[in-house]
Regions:
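Terminal connector regions
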Residues: 623-667
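Globin-like tetrapyrrole-binding proteins
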Residues: 745-747
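Low-complexity, Pro/Ser/Thr- and charge-rich linker/hinge segments at domain boundaries
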Residues: 663-683
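Conserved, compact domain cores that house catalytic/ligand-binding motifs in diverse enzymes
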Residues: 676-740
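Glycoside hydrolase catalytic-domain context in secreted enzymes
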Residues: 1-628, 642-646, 651
Length: 748
């Protein structure tokens, strides 16, 4: 069907109606013109199609669906193909349920470990987030189902999320909070984007023309439609439309539709703006309806197995002093309510009515396993009787496996966490069991990171995150070594909450402003810059085998920023079992003239190796791998100089390094003023010549610095002195207008 022809036949009221939902999940299409209504649905880790009572917080029933591991779990796979595959099976399920757009992926950056929706988000690192997200998008959209990449932008907290103001400087916004969205838009062309609730530097996302039009469309080339998060549209519907927010959800808000109609009729809204919005929405509607696959069926058993495989690749082994893998001949104690009733998904809009859930206790049928609940999930207080029962079970076992984590009541959409500690009764259980059983392994089920005051008292820790409906089976796959753990942390685990760079400002001020004062130093970027000890670093994860890196090679030692650099490194499995290693590539500039992180992730690859096998892993680095965002030129800029290329097992375990010299091809014309320093002016040949003569007559420059005991300090003071100050010290020896003459020559 021809979209422009359809628009020409639509009434003004029909156009306005299309720009808001028909109900909670459907679009209000002009059905009299043969355009059927389409449905959108949550969520990133399993579809949440509601047929009856609808809501956006997971309160009412939805159709049965497969619950896959959450974003925080899946991201630890560091596996692009896994993300593409997971998107593909979700897109297939959407076709079967007649859903035109899946509301995900959620790719906000984990600014703080307190973030209430961190379980949905992928990482603290924008490069990792963008790479995984674009593959997920490709997978979903390969099934002719759209995605809605969310929440655009700088939406890293739940506290006052509908009104908070994220105050972020431009460089930080570009490098950290917009970067993953940019990758997703440019590389995968998502059908839709969902704008967030919050304000960004004073302007609500739904009204933010600079974000929704200037950056998203004009810079990045986005050609789909932008929908609001549910209830994110402001009182000024016309302003939102003019900013580039086409679809208001949910519907039906007759008053807002009337705003649009009235604005067109009284001439305050150009009909072309409305027609453009309608065209963008119809393009996506028809892309789905004209290529629907109504014969598609869901194979729930196959999808359940897929959920298990994803969890197998994603869970992270954090500690193992030889206790793992377990043996099926051992007498085991499974302790903790989560062994019987696992926590496998988050609360809120991503909550799925799971097809079936397999617990660890159920998966262990046929083995010699004693179970003790250990705690009551409806309270945080310990029960002495439950603790004693747990200790008895532990004492009579060869190995005690304790299942603990964070409860639904502490971690959900709509609220942020207030602590990194587990509930008191979970902490007490680990302590009680480890006191009577030296062979204690802890399995943690939660959406984000926690502190571990008991870490030295146990022999093993498996971090299951929220592992989806097959979490129990996958947990046993890893505990028994049927699958070799290969997950790596996609976020840093700090030792204390207070160590996090956003700690002082996370919940905002009395004006509801949340200042991102840490700038680009989010996650490992901060901990590395501070050289701060952490509990577990970004990119960390153990295996049942070992890997050795060697022969890091660059295809050139010098390059321009317009060139590409090919990097290769050899990886050998030096252990006795097959395993997968995530090779991480970081780039840093030790002698940078600007404030930059020590290193930043710029590549990763997951490689499988048999015992004794060696493979060469190759990466290609282009301009952005070396660049930072310069606000004075409003563009990405590569500073000339030496860069260190690091092949690593984690952000703190660097295996090999090499150096490449990069020359910038961007010429930046410096504008000199009376406030320019002597050091800055001396960088110019003209400045060196003229200032040399002026300083020869300056009493400060003539002084013998060593005689007055200042030495290097005197030289530093002179270097940092502004031109206006130097001229004032010159007295009569400096001719009138000398400064203006110098500036004219410098700026010529």
């Amino acid at each position: 069907m021809d979209v422009k022809s359809i628009i020409s036949q639509m009434t003004l009221e029909e156009k306005a109606a299309l720009c808001s939902g028909k109900d909670f999940w459907h679009l209000d299409t002009p059905q009299r013109l043969g355009i059927e209504s389409v449905m959108v649905s949550d969520g990133p880790c399993g579809i949440r199609k509601q047929s009856d009572a609808a809501d956006h917080l997971g309160l009412n029933a939805s159709v049965p669906a497969t619950s896959y591991p959450t974003g925080s779990c899946m991201a630890c796979s560091f596996d692009r193909e896994l993300f593409r595959r997971s998107g593909e099976v979700l897109g297939h399920a959407c076709q079967a349920e007649d859903l035109s757009v899946l509301l995900g992926p959620a790719i906000n950056i984990k600014r703080s470990p307190l973030g209430g929706r961190n379980f949905e988000y992928l990482s603290e690192d924008p490069y990792l987030t963008g790479e995984l997200a674009k593959n997920y998008i490709n997978g979903v959209q390969s099934q002719n189902v759209g995605v809605s990449v969310k929440h655009f932008a700088a939406n890293s907290q739940e506290y006052n999320r509908m009104s908070s103001d994220s105050v972020v400087d431009e460089r930080t916004l570009r490098e950290i909070y917009l970067s993953a969205f940019e990758t997703a838009v440019k590389d995968s062309k998502p059908w839709t984007i969902m704008c967030s609730y919050n304000r960004i530097n004073g302007t609500f996302a739904a009204e933010n023309k600079r974000l929704l039009t200037d950056i998203l469309r004009d810079e990045w080339g986005f050609d789909g439609y932008v929908m609001s998060d549910w209830g994110a549209t402001t009182a000024d519907r016309v302003k939102c439309l003019e900013a580039g927010m086409e679809l208001e959800m949910p519907g039906k808000n007759a008053a807002n539709d009337k705003q649009i109609v009235d604005a067109v009729n009284n001439g305050t809204l150009d009909i072309k703006v409305l027609d453009t919005a309608v065209e963008r929405i119809l393009n996506i509607v028809l892309k789905y309806t004209e290529n629907k696959q109504p014969e598609t069926k869901i194979d729930f058993e196959a999808d359940h197995e897929e959920a298990r495989k994803i969890a197998d690749e994603s869970m992270v082994l954090l500690k193992n002093d030889g206790i793992l893998p377990l043996k099926r001949s051992q007498k085991l104690a499974f302790i903790g309510k989560f062994a019987e009733t696992p926590r496998f998904q988050g609360g809120g809009s991503s909550h799925v009515n799971s097809y079936k859930v397999t617990s660890a206790l159920e998966a262990a049928k046929g083995l010699d396993v004693t179970y003790a609940p250990g705690y009551d999930t409806n309270t945080t207080e310990s029960d002495e009787a439950l603790l004693k029962e747990a200790q008895e079970a532990a004492k009579n076992a060869d190995v005690a496996v304790v299942f603990v984590g964070i409860t639904d009541a502490m971690e959900s959409e709509g609220m942020d966490r207030r602590t990194l500690s587990m509930p008191k009764n979970h902490e007490a259980l680990v302590k009680a069991v480890s006191e009577v059983q030296k062979n204690t392994v802890v399995v943690v089920m939660c959406g984000g990171c926690i502190t571990m005051p008991w870490i030295d008292a146990v022999r093993g820790v498996l971090y299951a995150y929220l592992g989806g409906e097959a979490v129990g089976t996958a947990t046993l796959d890893l505990l028994f070594g049927d699958v070799n753990p290969s997950g790596k942390l996609a976020e840093t685990f700090p030792r204390r909450l207070e160590d996090n760079p956003s700690y002082l400002y996370f919940f905002g001020d009395e004006q509801n402003k949340t200042e991102y004062r840490e700038g680009v130093f989010v996650g490992y970027r901060y901990y590395d810059k501070k050289n701060m000890d952490v509990l577990f670093p970004f990119g960390y994860g153990l295996s049942y085998t070992t890997f050795e890196y060697s022969n890091l090679t660059l295809d050139k030692s010098k390059m321009k920023d317009t060139d590409t650099l090919t990097v290769s490194v050899n990886v050998r499995n030096t252990g006795k079992v097959k395993g997968k290693e995530v090779v991480q590539l970081y780039v840093g500039m030790p002698e940078s003239h600007t404030i930059r992180p020590v290193k930043e992730l710029r590549g990763f690859e997951k490689v499988e190796l048999e015992p004794g096998e060696e493979k060469t892993v190759t990466f290609t680095l282009a301009k952005r791998a070396f660049a930072y965002y310069r606000t004075d030129i409003s563009d990405w800029y590569v500073e000339s100089g030496d860069y260190t290329i690091m092949a690593a097992k984690s952000s703190r375990d660097i295996a090999c390094t090499a150096t490449v010299n990069v020359t910038s091809t961007t010429q930046i014309k410096r504008v000199y003023t009376m406030n320019s320093t002597i050091e800055e002016i001396m960088e110019s040949p003209v400045g060196r010549e003229i200032l040399g003569k002026m300083m020869a007559q300056n009493p400060l420059a003539q002084a013998d610095a060593d005689d007055i005991g200042m030495g290097e300090a005197m030289a530093r003071m002179m270097a940092e002195m502004p031109l206006r100050a130097l001229l004032s010290f010159g007295g009569d020896s400096v001719p009138a207008g000398a400064g203006e003459m110098l500036l004219k020559q410098l700026n010529a």
